[in-house]
Amino acid sequence: MANIKSAKKRAVQSEKRRKHNASRRSMMRTFIKKVYAAIATGDKEVAQKAFNDMQPIVDRQAGKGLIHKNKAARHKSNLVARINAMQ
């Protein structure tokens, strides 16, 4: 454990941020999994709705630095390609 007061404070802040980020990351991953699950069912409308729900969440987390913007773009590109490939 840190001895200096500012280091103790930083440790507390880091732990608080870690928990907050873990929660946000988990939520984002859940939205992404819902899109994959909708694609697996084969219903294009449901998959499109799930994608539309997921997209602003991923963009928001990328904007806040939780994930890199290129990773967000890669997720969206991959999922929209899978949705467009459906009949």
Swiss-Prot record:
InterPro entries: Ribosomal_bS20 (IPR002583), Ribosomal_bS20_sf (IPR036510). SUPFAM superfamilies: Ribosomal protein S20. One of its GO terms (molecular function) is structural constituent of ribosome. Residues 1-27 are annotated as: Disordered. One of its GO terms (biological process) is translation. Belongs to the bacterial ribosomal protein bS20 family. Binds directly to 16S ribosomal RNA. HAMAP family: Ribosomal_bS20 (MF_00500). This is Small ribosomal subunit protein bS20.
